[in-house]
C-alpha cells in the first residue's frame, strides 16, 4: 500500500508579499525550502493560520536568506502580507517505509529566519 505522508513543512512563516498579477505559485526563500527538503516546482499545500484558508500551488525558489514568502496569482486573494502560514509538502511512501519515515519540520522566527529544524513533531 502507498500512503500520502508529510514529507516536510515550514511552520508559521510570515507572508511578506502577495502578487495578484503573477502567473501563480508561491515564492519561498531558498534557504527555507532546502531546509524542509522541498523542491522547486513541487506541489505544496498552504494553510493560513489567520483566516483558515487552504490552497495548493507549486514552489518557486526565492533569493537565499531573503525571508521572502510571496503568494502569487489567485492565491494572493486568499493570503495577505503579514499572515502566518504553514507550507506543507507530502510524499507517497510505501507503508513499510512510512512507519519509520521522519519528515523535516522547519520552525521559523517572525522574520522567516530558521529557528529550529527537526525530523519529527512532538506534541505533549
UniProtKB/Swiss-Prot annotation:
Gene3D superfamilies in alphabetical order: 2.40.40.20
Post-translational modification: Is synthesized initially as an inactive proenzyme, which is activated by self-cleavage at a specific serine bond to produce a beta-subunit with a hydroxyl group at its C-terminus and an alpha-subunit with a pyruvoyl group at its N-terminus.
Alphabetically ordered keywords of this record: Autocatalytic cleavage, Cytoplasm, Decarboxylase, Lyase, Pantothenate biosynthesis, Pyruvate, Schiff base, Zymogen
Modified residues (Pyruvic acid (Ser)): 25
Catalytic residues in the record: 25 (schiff-base intermediate with substrate), 58 (proton donor)
Binding residue positions for substrate: 57, 73-75
Subunit structure: Heterooctamer of four alpha and four beta subunits.
Protein name: Aspartate 1-decarboxylase
Amino acid at each position: 500500500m502507498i500512503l500520502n505522508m508529510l514529507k516536510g513543512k515550514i511552520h508559521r512563516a510570515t507572508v511578506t508579499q502577495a502578487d495578484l498579477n503573477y502567473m501563480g505559485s508561491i515564492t519561498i526563500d531558498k534557504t527555507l525550502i532546502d531546509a524542509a527538503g522541498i523542491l522547486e516546482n513541487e506541489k505544496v499545500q498552504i494553510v493560513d493560520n489567520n483566516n483558515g484558508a487552504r490552497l495548493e500551488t507549486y514552489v518557486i525558489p526565492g533569493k537565499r536568506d531573503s525571508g521572502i514568502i510571496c503568494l502569487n496569482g489567485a492565491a494572493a486573494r486568499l493570503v495577505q502580507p503579514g499572515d502566518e502560514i504553514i507550507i506543507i509538502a507530502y510524499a507517497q511512501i510505501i507503508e513499510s517505509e512510512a512507519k519509520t519515515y521522519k519528515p523535516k519540520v522547519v520552525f521559523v522566527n517572525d522574520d522567516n529566519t530558521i529557528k529550529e529544524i527537526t525530523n519529527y513533531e512532538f506534541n505533549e
